[in-house]
């Protein structure tokens, strides 16, 4: 008996992105097409300035509509992301598609504790009580192998090392078990040993949740791993 082909989590067809320079629209990403199935990993590889991160931001609908223009189609589980109202897109971000950025200090709010920021994901998207959200957040910190998670819940981003901050970002991104994880150079700022640990962690959590991973990097060594 033939095994049915899984439906793609993400389908990108002829995606192009242009930015405005004065009165001129300059195309920086041209006609990208690919599909990504559950549990699969796809790497977008290129040098700095090649449009890798712009592609990811376009998929997430995070580019300013005033100064950028996105053409083509992006479908998540059969829904056209480019056609959705912004309110619906906000619900999808985090719940169905999440992103890990290169430098977690630019994504984590320095004024709030690590635990608070992870708990807010559960409160905002799932309506959990503060007590239950805290319990879930601590469990996630343990899952991403942060030692003494209950104590570190109340620490601020500057009290975490670079590798630990990236683990916290992974916990936040995977909190709601999204169908798609976009990892934008998640190990570039880390030393080789920590880099390997973070890659192993992403692969382990991907296997547990059958998550599709879009991995953005300039490093062929990372792709090989």
Give the predicted meaning of each segment.
Residues 132-151:
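Conserved ABC ATPase "signature" region
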Residues 196-210:
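Helical segment within the ABC ATPase nucleotide-binding domain
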Residues 45-46:
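The feature captures the beta-strand-to-loop junction immediately N-terminal to the Walker
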Residues 69-80:
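Conserved ABC transporter NBD signature motif
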């Amino acid at each position: 008996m033939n095994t049915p082909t899984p439906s793609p989590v993400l389908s990108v067809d002829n995606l192009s992105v242009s930015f405005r320079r004065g009165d001129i629209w300059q195309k920086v990403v041209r006609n990208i097409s690919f599909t990504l199935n559950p549990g699969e990993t796809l790497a977008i590889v290129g040098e700095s300035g090649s449009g890798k991160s712009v592609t990811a931001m376009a998929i997430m609908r995070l580019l300013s509509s005033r100064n950028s223009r996105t053409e083509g189609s992006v479908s998540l589980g059969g829904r056209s992301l480019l056609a959705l109202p912004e309110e619906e897109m906000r619900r999808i971000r985090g719940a169905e598609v999440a992103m890990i950025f290169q430098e977690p200090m630019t994504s984590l709010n320095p004024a709030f504790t690590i635990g608070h920021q992870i708990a807010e994901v559960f409160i905002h998207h799932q309506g959990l009580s503060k007590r239950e959200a805290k319990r879930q957040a601590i469990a996630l910190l343990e899952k991403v192998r942060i030692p003494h998670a209950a104590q570190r819940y109340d620490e601020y981003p500057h009290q975490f090392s670079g590798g630990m901050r990236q683990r916290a970002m992974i916990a936040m991104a995977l909190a709601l078990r999204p169908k798609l994880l976009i990892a934008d150079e998640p190990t570039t700022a880390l030393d080789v040993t920590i880099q390997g640990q973070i890659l192993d962690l992403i692969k382990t959590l991907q296997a547990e949740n059958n998550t599709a991973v879009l991995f953005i990097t300039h490093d062929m060594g990372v792709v090989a791993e």
